[in-house]
Amino acid sequence: MSKGTEGHFDTLPIGRLGLIPLNSSAALGKKVDDYLVSWRKGRGNEFAEKYVAAYEGYERDSYIIQSQVPRFGSGEAKGIINESVRGDDIYILLDVCNYSLTYSLCGYTNHMSPDDHFQDLKRVIAAIGGKARRINVIMPFLYEIRQHKRSGRESLDCALGLQELTAMGVENIITFDAHDPRVQNAIPLHGFETIQPAYQFIKNILRNAPDMKLDKDHLMVISPDEGGMGRAIYMANNLGVDMGMFYKRRDYSTIIDGRNPIVAHEFLGADVKGKDMIIIDDMISSGESMLEVAKLLKDREARNIYMCSTFGLFTSGLEKFDKAYEEGLFTKVLTTNVVYQTPELLSREYYISCDLSKYIALIIDKLNHDASISGLLDPADRIQKVIKKFKNHEKI
């Protein structure tokens, strides 16, 4: 990791940078912190006339602000900040899907749910007590994003969650691949950014598929449903290939586990025979839909199948994926490290983890200087550079 190589800014920071990774994102937070420390080493002295070298706390050995959320025996909790954050530009990082964390509830071991993580976030914000200059929340998997619209007498949990955060003083909310970005309409006067990791997916696929041919005759991008067409079109356009999609026929007369069951997947697109497939979606929950799509593509004689998803939840375990891999239904599964990854998942030979820590660090570095992040929201230039390297047989 080279020192002082990322970012040259013409503005002073909004405030002293402070990073608060909650326990759910401790490992990711450490990686983000390492990047920030490396980039800022020497930057203040090198550009003293712009940065003011003596700017308090600009260059530090760590930007992590120590915090904790201890619990009482009843399961109740409180947020604690262990150092001053007065005047700081705070970035709180959390993973609401990290079920590996536990706490004692009246003598019983209780795994933390998304609700628990969201409450802990609010506790930490409350502990800051309005003393920070600005509070930004980086929540890669947006809390309750799948409950973004109302069908009948239902609660709008995602909108309520966003409004709670802004009411507590949060100015910016950064998330990845929001299931429906229109939920930002709940907080139209506050910062809300949703980022797609298409660049990381393309880079990691090309690293692991040296024989892939990037043309319409040998590659297609597939959306497993109509809701994900936007991300599939974006990736297909950047790769210069065609896209196809499946739409789900559902039984609207039945409700199972809160949803109408899928009756069949119908395909719309060109012939897939002999072509490599990139299936891209926002999340793998149980994985049944993704595996069904892979099977249907294999039935149509597709070649290699790469399944990409920002969030690999694998709520029903890995057995179905293990079996499908043994049967040759797919080549690789790619998800990111912004949600909890089990040791079992990381050990699978078919699994590729896409690290987003540098991406998050870049966002924080720019926002702290109130600089534009447009180039990070649309990484088309970076994607084209990777594709050029791949075609020239250079190391990616």
Write out the residue ranges for each language-model feature.
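PRPP-associated nucleotide enzymes
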Residues: 1-396
